[in-house]
Amino acid sequence: MYKRQVDVGPTATPDGKPVAGTARTETWVARSVCKGTDCVATVAVVNPQDAAGAPLYTMVFDYLDGDWLQVREAPDKCKVGDVDTDVQGWTVISLTPQLDGSMNGEYTWATAPALCANKRAIHLTPTTGSGVSVTAPDPALEPPLRPAPGAALRGVYTYSQTYRETGQTFPPHDYKATTYCLRTGDRCVSLMSTIDTNNLFVMLYGDGRFSASFPEGDAECTDGVGKVRQTSRDDLPLPQGPQDPIVALTGTSFQEYIGDCPAKVELDVKLQRVGD
């Protein structure tokens, strides 16, 4: 059993400036165990209001390629304008051990759809002291890490849409795909960021397919007078046969327009891998 002081850095504005009051400090109690080359750690996050009571929550980390990685999916809140919106949140924590016993890494939080997202620096320092009687769960009792087919979506992909009726292709965009999966291997989140502007959309993997729901938006009718509210979602089945990394995904983009010129449109959508 070991104890860590955890410093989570501030969130940032779109231009990279830190947001005042968003940094925080936590206390973690952790345990780890290795079976051969497979190592797993459990963490209990201490409740600052009751350090001797039940933890706020627990986490499980796996040691992969030199880093400790934790992926968690849970209902969450995202502030859109002045409104708190219910969302499905994904938290990814990646930690790299340092020679002095500390750890440095990144704390990433994103929602699906991508209404909110941020990335912070995180630093763990070994600590000692009394007043904490919380224990982390026994890591030896954790089920083994399962392989995740969705993890194969990684690298740079060109995203393109084609209008079925006319063959018109809309301007393509390149995205860097970084995918993180739950320990069960059945669900994953893919963070798709544009190469030049770091704009983000979020894809989810589950039940053998990738999906993406995009934030609603307002648009003008083609007559330039009326207005509609647009919703859009993509559905892309996992390709047949093993691919690692995934070379291409093809599927359908479903778009609906509600308002003065209502319509439902289906587009062919494709993600084509073009690099690492």
Where are these regions (language model features)?
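Tryptophan-anchored aromatic micro-motifs
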Residues: Y2-G21, E26, A44-P48, G105, ...
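A short hydrophobic beta-strand element
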Residues: Y2-V6, C39-T42, W68-R72, G101-Y107, ...
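Flexible, membrane-facing loop/turn or short amphipathic-helix motifs
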Residues: G9-V19, D76-T85, T111-R120, T162-Q168, ...
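Beta-strand-enriched cores of mature, soluble protein domains
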Residues: A30, Q88-T91, M103-T108, N118, ...
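A short, structured loop/turn motif at beta-sheet edges
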Residues: S32-D38, F61-D67, S94-M103, T128-G131, ...
